[in-house]
Design a protein with these regions (language model features):
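Short hydrophobic alpha-helices and adjacent helix-cap/hinge residues
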Residues: 1-247
Length: 247
């Protein structure tokens, strides 16, 4: 539609839940190794958190411009193959670091504003003492958890409770929600995959909501808006295919 004539080759990494993460580095390396010398592309387009993490985790990155989409400004590098991801405490990485190092990068990033969400919570519920963060057993869930933990290091008098899908299924999460202490606010990150690699759709948040409907709930990523979450500062998600093509 944009008048381009260059051929496009599509590769799919088939990434699913977080326990597979140690394998993604090798998958990406295998894809990159297919396109060398006379087969070298003019541009690499990376879509999705898992593919992006696999690319930046490469020891050697080809000197080819990269466009990215459907990824977060915050990231974490992939773990070693012998690591138990349920106990993994990754380091927060800002994508700007790679731009500063000379990576030819463009595209569209999602930015999650933890501080603004905490400020909103405090404005509406000034007696809040605990933030219960819900994240799932995916790369995106853990990257979001890592970001929240980093941002809350500088926030005094506020305790972070992790409702972590790496260690729980929806039933154990529901029990934890039932037993949350007073003066707690729930902050929803994401919930698609649980500890058993069970996949969930929107009805999961309805189940969580009924566990303790008296607890105020906010959202980082628009999950729960319209039925559970009061509100929150979230990225503006939208189709980006045509915009990437124009880039």
């Amino acid at each position: 539609r944009g008048g381009g004539i260059s051929p496009v080759v599509i590769e799919n990494m088939n990434c699913k839940s977080l326990p597979e993460a140690p394998l993604w580095d090798g998958k990406m390396r295998g894809i990159l190794d297919k396109y060398k010398e006379n087969n070298t592309p003019q541009l690499i387009i990376i879509l999705g958190q898992e593919a992006w993490a696999s690319y930046i985790s490469q020891e050697y990155k080809p000197d080819i411009p990269v466009l990215c989409g459907m990824i977060s400004k915050n990231a974490i590098l992939l773990p070693d193959s012998d690591l138990n991801v349920a106990e993994w405490e990754p380091k927060y990485i800002d994508i700007q670091e790679y731009v500063d190092k000379g990576l030819h990068l463009g595209g569209f990033l999602y930015s999650y504003d933890v501080k603004e969400n905490i400020r909103l919570i405090h404005n509406l519920y000034p007696k809040t003492q605990n933030i219960a963060l819900i994240t799932d057993n995916t790369y995106g869930g853990l990257a979001m958890q890592t970001l929240v933990k980093k941002e809350m290091e500088n926030i005094k008098d506020l305790n972070l409770i992790l409702l972590d899908g790496r260690k729980n299924n929806i039933y154990t999460i529901v029990e934890q929600i039932k037993n949350l202490p007073d003066q707690t606010v729930i902050l929803i990150g994401t919930w698609r995959v649980d500890v058993n690699d069970g996949y969930y759709v929107g009805n999961a948040t309805y189940t969580m909501m009924t566990a303790n409907p008296r607890i105020p709930t906010f959202t980082l990523a628009s999950v729960g808006i319209g039925h559970w979450a009061i509100g929150g500062f979230s990225p503006k998600y939208r189709p980006i295919g045509s915009d990437l093509a124009k880039e």
